[in-house]
Amino acid sequence: MQPCACVAHVSTRKVEYMFLPKLKFLHHLLKALVAPCRTAQPGAFSALALLHRCGAVVLLGVVTLHAAAQQDPAFAHYWQLEPQLNPATVGRTPQLNIAAALQMHAAGYEDGGSTMYAGADMAFQIGKTRHGVGAIFQNDEFGLFSHKRFSVQYAYHLKLWGGTLSIGAEADMLNESVQGSKADLGDANDPAFPSTDLSGSKFDASVGVYYAHRHWYAGLAAQHLTAPTVFLGETNEYKVKRLYNFIGGYNIKLRNSFFTIAPSTLLRYDGSAFRADITARVLYEHQKRRLYAGLTYSPQHSVTGFVGGSFHGVDLSYSYEANTSGMGLGAGQHEITLGYRLDLKLGKKGKNLHRSVRYL
């Protein structure tokens, strides 16, 4: 009989609850290692030696993943979901913009988790001043953990230096929850993990600035300004880190062609972990139809391929993010993004509030 890789009693007490929600690989590792123990016969392995071995593996996974992971979800189609990153981007175009995205994590793994995003924003004009409002809902689930965010956003848009300067702010309600009643850790009395369902909420805030010129754009935002600590019961807590991000891009229109090259980048830093997404897209646009494809490279994280298009105001795109570390290429993320734009006649008729240089 093969040795049983049992970690039912590994020192999970050393793993702080605040780190658990993002340790996706650890979750699957624990589940895979615990399962064989349920059918193992006594004496089939040396418990003490195995405990030390498994404990080292688990703690190594904890340290590695915590050092590399950020708390907020990373969408592959970040240029389509800019309000998720920066409140200054709401109301930048004269249409009502509706966007939704679904990301499935850890392909091939049971309970790999998913992230859902839904948002809408619109522009309006008061006198000669231009404004934007929006709202988003986001639900990030992984195993027994759930992270929800509801935000209302406002932006002020000002013509400046031949482009548009936008300043935005948002108010957030964060909710963290864990289904402790569904946990199967072998030891029902283990105090390291809650045995009942717990949840907690806290208010938060974010701010951002964004500048768009004819062919290029750039934005900077600070999220989770209050860095709240969400309490779940009396003994568990989840500490939210401040997150700073920069987004920028340039549209290069090829001469005598329907093609545009649109490089862009997204940089994120939360005080301990840094992530850079470097994207190259090729767009074909003709007779109100737009098709695009491209690649994103995130050093030490992943490579993403995507394809999509726009038809009569409806945007549909798909991507697959292959991990270059951790669980490997086959355990990546599938993502589908859907968008819709509806023309609104607010403010002065016949005049667009401002044009967007961002290609969806």
Place the predicted regions along the sequence by residue.
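Subset of outer-membrane beta-barrel
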Residues: 70-360
